[in-house]
UniProtKB/Swiss-Prot annotation:
Keyword Mitochondrion set for record: no
Family membership: Belongs to the UPF0294 family.
Protein's organism: Salmonella typhimurium (strain LT2 / SGSC1412 / ATCC 700720)
Phylogenetic lineage: Bacteria, Pseudomonadati, Pseudomonadota, Gammaproteobacteria, Enterobacterales
Source species, domain of life: Bacteria
SUPFAM superfamilies: DNase I-like
Entry protein name: UPF0294 protein YafD
Length: 266
């Protein structure tokens, strides 16, 4: 699906820019000169949320209350309505969205809002075999204060498929990206891991990529068939805090995680 795969970048005061996938992995960290780091603090705050195409009331107040202090907001099913684009460009230096499929007015897909300009951007898409709808993922890279580069992977996994072949196939290009990156990584989103085979495929992938799972003590994540759908995985960072915000503003609850980019846990 490379032909129709691209990201749209929204920056305040500038026209939206279409970004195509890079030609090679060599461009990771070399595509653009590193600008301001993602965070000048000793912590990185992220919000991860399937926003349900902003179909419910209060989604904007949740973003305003909990997203504006985050360095990264990873949204799934984000529809580029004027309200969302305005919030994104008013509060973040960059907002990158991969349109999974185009609705009559506004494209919907994963969208990453960031407090720094990415130095690398790679959009990915995979088509669901049954409904023929596409799900998207986005790989972006940001400079950290300690000169390391943080790779961020925003994922909305395919939902309707027989077996796990297509599910695993969507993870393959993500794995290629992570394997070519030596620095810290955050991979998060709606993984639609509602069956044991899907859960096993996801955990196997995380192990192969040396990613740890963020644990939530009061685990109020959205579930299907008793299994959580939303996850945050990481490497090369420490987890300071992790919580789930209970809200009716979407059919998923947002995940809030604070990392410190100091020496990783052994």
């Amino acid at each position: 699906m490379r032909k129709n795969t691209y990201a749209m970048r929204y920056v305040a005061g500038q026209p939206a820019e279409r970004i195509l996938p890079p030609g090679s992995f060599a461009s990771i960290g070399q595509a653009l000169p590193a600008g301001e780091p993602l965070s000048n603090e000793e912590r990185i705050r992220i919000l991860v949320w399937n926003i349900f195409k902003q179909q419910r009331a209060e989604w904007l107040s949740v973003l305003k209350n909990y997203g504006k202090d985050a360095h990264l907001v990873l949204l799934q099913e984000a529809q580029t309505t004027p309200e969302l684009v305005q919030f994104a460009t008013a509060n973040y230096l960059a907002a990158d969205q991969v349109p999974a499929f185009v609705l009559p007015q506004h494209p919907s897909g994963v969208m990453t809002l960031s407090a720094a300009h990415p130095v690398y951007c790679c959009p990915l898409r995979e088509r669901e075999p049954i409904l023929r709808l596409a799900k998207s993922a986005l790989v972006t890279v940001y400079p950290l204060p300690d000169t390391r580069l943080l790779m961020v992977v925003n994922v909305h996994a395919v939902n309707f498929s027989l077996g796990v072949d297509v599910y695993s196939k969507q993870l393959l290009p993500i794995g290629d990206q992570i394997a070519h990156h030596s620095g810290p990584v955050i991979m998060a989103g709606d993984f639609n891991a509602w069956s044991r085979p899907r859960m096993n495929a996801l955990y196997r992938f995380a192990r192969e990529m040396s990613l740890r799972q963020v644990r939530f003590t009061d685990d109020q994540r959205r579930r299907a068939f008793g299994r959580p759908l939303d996850f945050v995985f990481y490497r090369g960072l420490n987890v300071n805090e992790a919580s789930v915000l209970v809200t009716r503003a979407s059919d998923h609850n947002p995940l809030l995680v604070e990392f410190s980019p100091g020496k990783p846990e052994q």
